[in-house]
């Protein structure tokens, strides 16, 4: 099946990924974003979320790996590069210990010449047991080769 036939279709849903406190702490160290809502368990327990929460950018960073999992080699290229993100919104904080997954819908396919193709995918990072997603974004990928 040609990939353009899948425009408007759900490509799939990734596996659930636990947002452990260890993952959050590691991200805080890597990015030097050690705000108390992320790393101070005692203070966060008294805060608005009742526990620590993941950085929005940590949740966003999981999009790359989950996209690779969902899309796999269906794009028919040797490699895919991050091209950009449109309409990114952080909707619901992800509490420590929660699980997230990525639901992916192919929005568009645009040939860019020289064997390159620009793909636009609607990504929704869902939180297990929550009606509202963690984030929504239109993710752009450039496939080549």
Residue locations for each model-derived region?
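HotDog/MaoC-like acyl-thioester-processing domains
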Residues: 2-6, 93-145
């Amino acid at each position: 099946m040609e990939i353009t036939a899948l425009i408007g279709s759900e490509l799939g849903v990734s596996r659930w990924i636990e947002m452990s406190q260890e993952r959050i702490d590691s991200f805080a160290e890597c990015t030097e974003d050690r705000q108390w809502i992320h790393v101070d368990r005692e203070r966060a327990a008294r805060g608005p979320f009742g526990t620590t929460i993941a950085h929005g950018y940590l949740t966003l960073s999981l999009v790359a790996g989950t996209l690779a999992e969902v899309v796999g080699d269906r794009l028919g290229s040797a490699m895919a590069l991050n091209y950009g993100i449109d309409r990114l919104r952080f909707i619901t904080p992800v509490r420590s210990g929660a699980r997230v997954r990525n639901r992916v819908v192919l929005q568009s396919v645009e040939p860019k010449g020289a064997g390159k193709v620009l793909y636009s995918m609607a990504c929704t990072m869902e939180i297990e047991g929550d009606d509202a997603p963690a984030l929504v974004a239109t993710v752009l990928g450039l496939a080549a080769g």
